[in-house]
């Protein structure tokens, strides 16, 4: 199932969802019509599986990405002269003063539980043979893929919310919360059971879908964070999954760091293990991160058919962009910085509070509350083709082989085994091609403290350093940030390294250990009396 076919199935499914949501049909009657009397054919087998992925497309940038990156220390969205306050919704994420009514948190809950429901429905149709299968083997492979995808959705949910409802059937009963550790056990068990049945093909027909190596990478991530979830570390279990992926010979690093983020050619990538495919022309939309981060004048630089959102919102925190080592090409491969020109090489100019001045993106932010239209480096990680609309057709990778190598490195460090430096060096090599010797890092160096300058910033200066305790394996934390910033890892990494609720950065100060999880959305609590609010959020 190539990307074009896969996105076609997703677009058809999204259209169907839109039609259903606009009806006023009784749920029982509708279920009876579709599942008991609708004449499914063999042609419905592929779309049934593809449709379960739809929650990823429309639920990423505005919900998952914001809750994972804007809550961390690398990216911030201060207000500016063109707007971007929006009632303080972005600042609440940065300041960690969110509540149960914040829209991004509610949408995160809704989108990923929608994914669970889509998986349960698709599994139900296959298990009951309501949809014909090409063969017994393909039926089992399809069921394995859907169960793995459901496990992925559940991982994201219990990672973000802690105790959550665990539902695996099409029951209409209101569910109670299941303890986080039990949902963790379910996810581990599901993935362990289905991985042997997942397709081994890397890319090609499995592009955008969970194959065996993506399944193992998901399980490795769950094990990597097991101590956070259950109190018991599972480093060796994570190490085992990483070794399986590495030893398979199916996966590898791409020659260039930017290769995973190109608009074309990623389908054959050995590095991208799991991705969200987008296709604007087919209605599979939702990749608008560039629209949010870019200044409106950049339309002339990238020849877009849509105008980016005013002066742009998300931008790099100075404290993070200052950590890059000299010669690391990932700095320019990740961030748009310095003077900007249009597609013909003519200078661009400010149009808001710096109207008429040369458009030059500087790295300095005065604080996390307000910036001028030019302050802060902008998003430059993905290729955005000329002619792109408000959503581009470049895919968003969720899991890359480079993370497998860095997960293994972390497990080796945390179990006092040698070899972490060699793995991290392998990832760094493509970022230091001009000076290969600078790519080399040792095990001992990875055990050093982070180079991040923590503390509250006012008028461009750190005025309150806050907690300055050394970070265990802090250099490895830096390496992960340099490699994965903008990709939705920051919140989870900061929690695992013990700094999410301890450190200060930009205008953020610690707000309590309960911020390790989000509150259950108030609308969900109001709708289901069996749901209890997470501790410290109840009032």
Annotate each predicted stretch with a short phrase.
Residues 2-10:
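Bacterial N-terminal signal peptides that target proteins for export
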Residues 23, 481-482:
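Low-complexity, Ser/Thr/Pro-rich intrinsically disordered linker/stalk segments at domain junctions
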Residues 216-222:
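TPR/Sel1-like alpha-solenoid repeat signature
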Residues 23-47, 54-210, 223-228, 381-397, ...:
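Aromatic-anchored glycine-rich loop motif in surface-exposed flexible loops
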Residues 236-247, 425-429:
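TPR/TPR-like (Sel1-like) alpha-helical repeat modules
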Residues 265-268, 469, 485:
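Extracellular/periplasmic catalytic domains that process cell-envelope and extracellular macromolecules
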Residues 18-21:
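C-terminal motif of bacterial Sec signal peptides marking the signal peptidase cleavage site
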């Amino acid at each position: 199932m190539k990307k074009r076919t896969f996105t076609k199935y997703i677009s058809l499914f999204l259209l169907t969802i839109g039609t259903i949501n606009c009806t006023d049909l009784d749920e029982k009657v509708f279920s009876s019509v579709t599942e008991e009397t609708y004449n499914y054919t063999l042609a419905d087998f592929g779309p049934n599986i593809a449709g379960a992925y739809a929650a990823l497309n429309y639920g990423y940038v505005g919900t998952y990405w914001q809750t994972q990156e804007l809550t961390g220390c690398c990216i911030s969205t201060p207000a500016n002269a063109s707007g971007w306050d929006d009632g303080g919704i972005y600042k609440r994420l940065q300041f960690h003063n969110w509540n149960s009514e914040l829209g991004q948190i509610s949408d995160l809950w809704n989108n990923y539980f929608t994914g669970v429901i889509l998986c349960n429905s698709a599994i139900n149709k296959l298990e009951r043979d309501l949809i014909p299968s090409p063969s017994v083997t393909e039926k089992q492979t399809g069921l394995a893929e859907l169960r793995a995808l459901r496990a992925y959705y559940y991982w994201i949910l219990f990672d973000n919310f802690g105790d959550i409802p665990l539902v695996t059937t099409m029951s209409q009963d209101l569910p109670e919360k299941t303890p986080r550790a039990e949902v963790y056990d379910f996810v581990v068990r599901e993935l362990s059971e289905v991985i042997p049945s997942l397709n081994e093909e890397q890319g090609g027909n499995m592009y955008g879908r969970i194959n065996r190596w993506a399944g193992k990478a998901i399980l490795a991530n769950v094990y990597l964070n097991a101590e956070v979830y259950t109190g018991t570390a599972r480093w060796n279990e994570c190490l085992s999954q990483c070794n399986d992926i590495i030893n398979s010979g199916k996966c590898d690093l791409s020659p260039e760091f930017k290769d995973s983020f190109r608009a074309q050619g990623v389908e054959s990538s050995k590095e991208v293990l799991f991705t969200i495919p987008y296709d604007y022309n087919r209605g599979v939309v939702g990749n608008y991160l560039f629209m949010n981060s870019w200044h409106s004048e950049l339309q002339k630089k990238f020849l877009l058919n849509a105008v980016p959102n005013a002066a742009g919102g998300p931008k790099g925190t100075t404290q993070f962009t200052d950590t890059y080592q000299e010669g690391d090409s990932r700095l320019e491969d990740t961030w748009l910085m310095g003077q900007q020109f249009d597609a013909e090489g003519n200078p661009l100019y400010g149009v808001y509070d710096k109207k008429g001045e040369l458009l030059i993106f500087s790295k300095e932010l005065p604080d996390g509350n307000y910036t001028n239209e030019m302050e802060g480096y902008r998003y430059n990680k993905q290729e955005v083709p000329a002619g792109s609309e408000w959503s581009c057709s470049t895919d968003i990778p969720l899991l890359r082989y480079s993370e497998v190598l860095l997960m293994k490195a972390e497990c080796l460090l945390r179990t006092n085994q040698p070899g972490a430096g060699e793995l991290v060096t392998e990832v760094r090599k493509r970022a230091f091609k001009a000076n290969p010797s600078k790519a080399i890092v040792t095990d001992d160096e990875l055990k050093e403290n982070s180079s991040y300058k923590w503390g509250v910033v006012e008028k461009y200066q750190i005025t309150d350093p806050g907690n300055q305790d050394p970070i265990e394996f802090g250099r490895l934390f830096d390496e992960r940030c340099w490699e994965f910033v903008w990709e939705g890892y920051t919140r989870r990494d900061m929690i695992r390294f013990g700094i999410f609720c301890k450190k200060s950065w930009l205008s953020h100060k610690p707000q309590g250990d309960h911020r390790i999880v989000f509150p259950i959305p108030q609308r969900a609590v109001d709708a289901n009396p069996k749901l209890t609010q997470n501790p410290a959020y109840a009032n």
